[in-house]
Amino acid sequence: MDRYFFILTTIDLFVLGFMCFLTRLSESLNKKQKRGFFLAFALIAAISVLEVITIVVDGTPPGCRWLNILSNYLGFGLTPAVALCLVYVLDKKTIIRRGFKAAVCCEGGYLLFLAATLPYGPVFSVSAENLYARGGYFFIYVIMYYASMLYLMAATVRTAAAFQNRSHPLIYPLILFLGAETVIQIAFPALHVTWLCVTLLSVLYYIYCSEMWNQLDALTGLLNQNSYLNRTAEMRRSGGVLVVFDVDDFKQINDRYGHLQGDVCLAEIADCIKKAYARCGYCYRIGGDEFCVLLKDEASEARCAATLQSLLAERRKTLTILPTVSLGSAAFSGEDVVAVKDRADRALYCAKKEQKARAAAAKPADSEEKD
């Protein structure tokens, strides 16, 4: 076996082993994410070893033919599953989405197809002399491989967009890099660099996802305070709008119904803010019950605010304790964000006073109706 390939595989396995331990010891990943990354790294390591086995046993006495067939079958069959493991980590929720279930079924069907057609060798064959050869329908493997990569790319871009991650275009060059490498591998079969590249991609993907999740608030899924501070630290622009939100009488919700119900209310409010404003700006949770949005322009402000109030009213039909939300805004006009934030806060306080006045005026009317 080529010593160069053996050295690459050794480096590959070391990196994957390190990533497995890093995943296991991580305190920022939940159990589902740890499981997905661990399976992906372990699967890449296993397929890398299988590739070594196929090279070692190919052309040896026919007694090793079964090992050659098994190693190639598992290598070709399990390759698309790597992308599925990485898709699995994207959603922190324990619920398995329908699209992912369909992808798993496709992978299962592909494995069954490979097993059923082993005697005929459409994808690959191992002769009686124990010599490997690509089959006439080798493109089936290539299609499954590229389909899994495209599925990973689409799922990642969709998730990153939902999390308002500005670096989501970076996933495209990662997939293109792997796709180009695969073309080279197909054209030059003796050049065994596929799984080294897949290892590199998986490590970069781990870094990418960690960076994406580190920008999020764990409870609400909005961008967190640190993201807000970094984004606005030296921000000076014109044409945009800073909108700040505060939950009215939120302390009473916590005192009366408990902090768990308070968290439910915050999550619902955050979801409404994202649905109302995400297409027009970036949404942040900057404090306990404080949120803000950096709008791209003033034109969408009134429409987004109306949409938010409509969404909150709709949610209040099922979650009756959902409190009202006051907001204030200020346009950017070239000054630093601190000055803009101060003006937005003053507008917010005026809105809260008006909200309290309306609530106080409504109470006597309610009492008269009851009498």
Where is each model-derived feature located?
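Extracellular-loop-to-transmembrane junctions of the mid-late helices
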Residues: 3-11, 116-151, 185-191
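Hydrophobic alpha-helical transmembrane segments of multi-pass membrane proteins
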Residues: 8-64, 68-86, 104-121, 170-186
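Alpha-helical transmembrane segments in multipass membrane proteins, preferentially the mid-helix core
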Residues: 19-23, 85-89, 142-163
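Membrane-interface helix-boundary motifs at transmembrane edges
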Residues: 24-37, 91-101, 157-168
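Signal-transducing coiled-coil linker helices
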Residues: 154-157, 161-219, 226-240
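Conserved long alpha-helical elements within nucleotide-processing catalytic cores of c-di-GMP signaling
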Residues: 224-241, 251-278, 284-288, 292-293, ...
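Catalytic core regions of nucleotide second-messenger enzymes
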Residues: 285, 312-332
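Catalytic-core segments of nucleotide cyclases and related cyclic-nucleotide turnover enzymes
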Residues: 309, 326, 330-371
